[in-house]
Amino acid sequence: TKFFTEGLGVEPTVTGLDSAANEAMRKAKSLVQGFKNHLEYNELHSASKRLTEAYAVGEFLPALQTVSTAERRIILEYIRNGNALIKAMDVRDYAQAKNILESLKKRSSDFDSTKAEGAIAAFMRISNGHIRAAQMAMVNGDQAGFQEELKQATQVWPTNPKLDEIDERLDLLLDNSNLAK
């Protein structure tokens, strides 16, 4: 009674408690129905939100018991892929992030990819620009400029495949210069 009196400012009654319980069950049922409707149309982002809201109302309510394991699994995999995208972006693995993003877009018709796509494209372009500047510095014999631009490219996108290409070219150049000696 202290919870109701201090928190809500009213004395609990059987009718009030019954009304609150019925409202919670109605809300959970409505959210589960919304979840299933979104799932039917492959709107996984919205479906995951409705399912989360339904669980927040009450995990053990009867309406939530109607959600099958297969339906929960679809949402779990969607959330895991979303988390994998965030992790790939955090470690600046933009090639992997791009693959995960494409997978999410194919799986969910309501996934908003614009922010992630913009960030991936920008960071890839910045890294590639630094690589291009490094190559220009190398052509002009500016070793310090080459090293600085390569460092910048690596900081922006450490797994840029063009960095491997530069390493291969440098190895070939070094091998050829050793043969000439």
Where are these regions (language model features)?
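Amphipathic alpha-helical assembly segments used for oligomerization, scaffolding, or translocation
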Residues: 1-181
